[in-house]
C-alpha cells in the first residue's frame, strides 16, 4: 500500500448501502480507499472486489464509531502509516436506541 502521492478517501458505513456505492464510485476514479464499518466480513469482501476490479489500494478498518477509543485507534493507525485523508464520506448511521421523545438533545 503506497501512502504517499495518493488521494485517500475514508468512507464510514462502507459495509452497505450508500457507503458501499461511494466506495465503488471512488474506486472507479482510481482513489485509494479506507473502508470503515463494524462488520468486517462485508468490508473485506468489498475490498477484495474493488482491489481486483479497479486495482486500487483499499484499507479495511473495523471500527465502532460510537466508541471513542476505537476512533482514536483508527486515527493513530493512519498517522503511523503516514496516510492523510483527503476526502471524508461521513456516512455511518446512528440508530436511536429510544423513541424520539426520549432522546436527549
Summary of predicted features, one role per range:
Residues 95-105:
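Conserved mid-core segment of classical short-chain dehydrogenase/reductases
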Residues 8, 15-17:
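Conserved glycine-rich cofactor-binding loop
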Residues 26:
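Aromatic pocket-lining residues of Rossmann-like dinucleotide-binding sites
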Residues 1-10:
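Flexible N-terminal pre-Rossmann segment of NAD(P)-dependent oxidoreductases
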